[in-house]
Amino acid sequence: MARWQRKASVSSPCGRSIYRFLSLLFTLVTSVNSVSLPQSENPAFPGTLICDKDEVRIEFSSRFDMEKWNPSVVDTLGSEILNCTYALDLERFVLKFPYETCTIKVVGGYQVNIRVGDTTTDVRYKDDMYHFFCPAIQAETHEISEIVVCRRDLISFSFPQLFSRLADENQNVSEMGWIVKIGNGTRAHILPLKDAIVQGFNLLIDSQKVTLHVPANATGIVHYVQESSYLYTVQLELLFSTTGQKIVFSSHAICAPDLSVACNATHMTLTIPEFPGKLESVDFGQWSIPEDQWHANGIDKEATNGLRLNFRKSLLKTKPSEKCPFYQFYLSSLKLTFYFQGNMLSTVIDPECHCESPVSIDELCAQDGFMDFEVYSHQTKPALNLDTLLVGNSSCQPIFKVQSVGLARFHIPLNGCGTRQKFEGDKVIYENEIHALWENPPSNIVFRNSEFRMTVRCYYIRDSMLLNAHVKGHPSPEAFVKPGPLVLVLQTYPDQSYQRPYRKDEYPLVRYLRQPIYMEVKVLSRNDPNIKLVLDDCWATSSEDPASAPQWQIVMDGCEYELDNYRTTFHPAGSSAAHSGHYQRFDVKTFAFVSEARGLSSLIYFHCSALICNQVSLDSPLCSVTCPASLRSKREANKEDTMTVSLPGPILLLSDVSSSKGVDPSSSEITKDIIAKDIASKTLGAVAALVGSAVILGFICYLYKKRTIRFNH
């Protein structure tokens, strides 16, 4: 209700520099809400003074004669304040004025002086001055930081404690003026603290902080799920209100406590569900990597059905784990920063791979009697030195080794390179051992643990028998190529920008002479950049049938019709179209449909024939378009190659703009009226033809009857 705005400058005794707000927005709002103050000097004041946040408001009794007593704001001497602008509402008996120009600032607040004088007499009484005091509660701005802890079932928000009295053990927080607000706008869920506690919320206050626990399934929290990945967003406001002050703790958070993690021999893949936020950067260790530098730093992304981040295993750490017999890859304190609803929001997770096994026992041995496997240098930390790889106690070497990517591939015989054989149940198991040294051992002392060892295994089913045979196959059949379904559409647009076509329910459209009609033919459901849409002919008819007569040519053989005085103009699709070759845009002037200076009186229907061409190798003579048409003869079109499309509805042409001046040409009233006239004229013609036919038949019957009478006589 404030009409004037008052700004307060606040500085701390310590002379601290300007505070800055972090991702947590904290606002401390002070107000004195409808507090009726005692009148220290004259208890007979005929009204109630209210000290609001930005102004002073005096509400007089309805029995008070405002015009007679004329209340006014004055200084301590009773003189009117020159620059004070106050509002006096005679109907509602209310006087309002701002603090800045109508009060006197004193220690701790503002002095208010009101004079009430009888305007019907010149006699002044000494008790017509009233003095009041409005307290000023200063606002404080604090440099603060929030702590958000995300779990799958709970979010914990911690805010700094501002007033020690809130931590008073004698205070019953459930009865204080606390309100919890989850969400934003009209969909926000607002709860008094007492109701919130019943629904699983919890508020903890100590001398250092205020902590609110919010259940993850609370109304107002938005959840996003994809496969086994979970992410949710929450916008929180925690409000504390008491006499004369209002504190608002505000936070906006993204939580991803349970993202899907999958690991293979080369990468860790992190799956983030699709939601309106955009991932801007990732932080781990000492690195903060923006999106445009991910690939260069070993992070690749897949943005289909959500977002998948692939971290090279060389970026990961390893640790011993009680649940893993060997070691485990992980990323510590991975910080994901998103741009979401105008804010930069971060969440921290600790993704881990499943246990790494040094033994591979589930692979079938190759049919040629060999065992195939791969070794990566980053399978351990420190990395392996691939030049020191050995197979068992032999000198067998990998068949393929690339140091740049840290890969070595082996193809070792089952009867060589130290491969051992044993029987387990119905399986014949072959195993060998790979060992290598680390590139940078942790110390200069060499222990057995300084050498990397990995057991590799494969198996055959015990009753399997190896057979060698040569099978001669038939030659592969030749591919049969047949064009797929071709789907085209013809549309009209309001202007040359080609932003939004007219809908089907907007037809028939109304156009005047000299107005261009912007049309577009495009290919639907095709994303092949090698195909191109080529126009053959475009024409207009007075009925829906494309083959009806008369016909007015617009485009012939892919070019403007040369016999038109006002020729068709083609427009390029431009960079806004995903595949510009899938579009043909042009406009036609309505002069093309005027004969002997008279406009058409019926609806006009437009049609086009077109075909799809292969830009790599032109597969039809119709694909070769050379304009103008006078440079070549009329092309012979194969009807099987082309497809004819029509506008969704007709266009109504008006020959004279002045005849409908001041009327919207797209008005449905004009359209209905002219269509009605067109239908009426056609109906009248049909009735006239029917009457004429009846007269002729009657005349023939009359002649036949007369002839019969003469013949009988």
From Swiss-Prot:
Post-translational modification: Proteolytically cleaved before the transmembrane segment to yield the secreted ectodomain incorporated in the zona pellucida. Proteolytically cleaved in the N-terminal part by the metalloendopeptidase ASTL exocytosed from cortical granules after fertilization, yielding a N-terminal peptide of about 30 kDa which remains covalently attached to the C-terminal peptide via disulfide bond(s). This cleavage may play an important role in the post-fertilization block to polyspermy. Additional proteolytically cleavage of the N-terminal peptide of 30 kDa occurs in one-cell and two-cell embryos.
GO cellular component: collagen-containing extracellular matrix; egg coat; endoplasmic reticulum; extracellular region; multivesicular body; plasma membrane
The keyword Methyltransferase belongs to this UniProt entry's keyword annotation: no
Spans annotated as Disordered: 462-484
Residues of the propeptide: 634-713
Positions of disulphide bridges: C51-C134, C84-C102, C365-C458, C396-C417, C538-C608, C559-C627, C613-C623
Transmembrane segments: 684-703
Membrane topology: Single-pass type I membrane protein
Tissues where the protein occurs: Expressed in oocytes (at protein level).
Record's keyword terms, sorted: Cell membrane, Cleavage on pair of basic residues, Disulfide bond, Extracellular matrix, Fertilization, Glycoprotein, Membrane, Receptor, Secreted, Signal, Transmembrane, Transmembrane helix
InterPro entries documented for this protein: Zona_Pellucida_Domain_gp, ZP-C, ZP-C_dom, ZP-N, ZP_chr, ZP_dom, ZP_dom_CS
Signal peptide: 1-34
Family matches, as Pfam families: Ig_ZP2, Ig_ZP2_3rd, Ig_ZP2_N, Zona_pellucida, ZP-N
Residue span, ZP domain: 364-630
Compartments, as annotated in UniProt: Cell membrane
GO BP terms, alphabetized: binding of sperm to zona pellucida; prevention of polyspermy
Subunit structure: Can form homopolymers that assemble into long fibers (in vitro). Polymers of ZP2 and ZP3 organized into long filaments cross-linked by ZP1 homodimers. Interacts with ZP3.
Family per similarity comment: Belongs to the ZP domain family. ZPA subfamily.
Entry domain remark: The ZP domain is involved in the polymerization of the ZP proteins to form the zona pellucida.
Annotated PANTHER family: ZONA PELLUCIDA SPERM-BINDING PROTEIN, ZONA PELLUCIDA SPERM-BINDING PROTEIN 2
Protein name: Zona pellucida sperm-binding protein 2
